[in-house]
């Protein structure tokens, strides 16, 4: 699912860990937020207004959601973050009790929980985004094995680091087998274009590089299962979930409604995402998964076993690579009740829609 199709963001992950943040939450901290619902979201202002990427834009326009909040006298407060520093800003905002929810990726969320600030997945992110390994257009390199000892641009601490680790481990390789150059996607693309690196591991911007004849994709996750995709979810502060379950349910309902609408309006949704800078052809090809279809990609089903296994892998990677100092349990990151109830709440509305009522 493309909750965050613009997750190529800078994240000073190692700096956060090095600070040794071990902040244990005070359950009373969130009480000041009783009349507010504060959500961090990737925002883009290039279109003239403030637009949110993906699902949050639909939530912000959902009349059912907005009416319910108004009736309960709850102020909806969006906390825009730029694509330059999403994970850093989101984690800092959670730590400083400035937000209650955020749409963002798996590895930063694990790092946050290791500091003692507890969050849980309220609504899972469907199938996730594809990841790609791209080399210069005229490179003779054909496989990840051919890159052993060579320079690979990879933005460390970002969610797709997990996918890169998964790829090399599947070939019996380790990070130390490569010269990893820590570059954000913009710098990584420039480095590949200048041939100052031998490869670049990234998201759908690899398709743009290929279209411009600056690179060629030698591996992608498009034909692989959801376990190979980059994940982003709707995360909520645990103390808020415990203290305000009704408000949390309203947000979960709105998120599931948005996902349902997207699953039924592929062309319209994809066209709407072009305002954030990617060509329509790139957006369309990014979604061409061969192991699932569009409707399945946007399913909000809360697959506990799958998520537990996935986040156990993320935690293991974070521990082994010293990205976190305190191991956490994958099951503590999960909270399926809100999504499951949201799916039940959606069904009567879906029936009415089909009947034309």
What would you call each of these model-derived segments?
Residues 181, 186-277:
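Pocket-lining segment of extracytoplasmic ligand-binding domains
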Residues 315-357:
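Conserved C-terminal helix/tail region of periplasmic/extracytoplasmic solute-binding proteins
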């Amino acid at each position: 699912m493309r909750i965050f199709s613009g997750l190529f963001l800078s994240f000073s992950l190692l700096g956060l860990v090095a600070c040794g943040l071990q902040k244990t939450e005070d359950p009373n901290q969130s009480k000041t937020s009783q009349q507010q619902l504060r959500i961090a979201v990737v925002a883009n202002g290039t279109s003239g207004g403030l637009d949110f990427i993906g699902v949050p834009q639909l939530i912000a326009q959902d009349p059912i959601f907005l009416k319910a909040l108004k009736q309960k006298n709850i102020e909806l407060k969006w906390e825009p973050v730029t694509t330059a520093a999403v994970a850093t800003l989101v984690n800092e905002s959670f730590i400083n009790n400035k937000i209650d929810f955020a749409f963002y990726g798996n590895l930063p969320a694990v790092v946050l929980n290791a500091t003692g600030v507890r969050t849980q997945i309220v609504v899972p992110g469907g199938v996730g985004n594809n990841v790609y390994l791209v080399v210069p257009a005229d490179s003779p390199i054909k496989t990840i094995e051919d890159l052993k000892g060579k320079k690979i641009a990879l933005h460390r601490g970002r969610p797709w680091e997990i996918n890169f680790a998964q790829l090399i481990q599947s070939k019996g390789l380790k990070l130390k087998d490569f010269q990893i150059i820590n570059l954000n996607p913009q710098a990584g693309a420039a480095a590949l274009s200048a041939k100052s690196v031998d490869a670049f591991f990234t998201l759908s911007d690899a398709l743009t590089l290929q279209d411009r004849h600056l690179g060629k994709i030698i591996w992608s996750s498009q034909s692989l299962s959801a376990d190979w995709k980059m994940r982003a979810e709707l995360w909520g502060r645990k103390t808020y979930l415990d203290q305000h379950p009704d408000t949390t349910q309203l947000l979960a309902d709105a998120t599931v409604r948005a996902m349902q609408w997207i699953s039924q309006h592929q062309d319209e949704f994809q066209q709407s995402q072009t305002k954030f800078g990617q060509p329509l052809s790139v957006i369309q090809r990014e979604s061409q998964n061969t192991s699932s279809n569009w409707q399945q990609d946007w399913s909000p089903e809360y697959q506990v076993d799958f998520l537990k296994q996935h986040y156990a892998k993320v935690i293991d990677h974070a521990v082994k690579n010293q990205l976190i100092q305190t191991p956490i349990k994958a099951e503590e990151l999960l909270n399926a009740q809100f999504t499951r109830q949201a799916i039940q709440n959606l069904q009567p509305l879906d029936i009415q829609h089909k009947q034309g009522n």
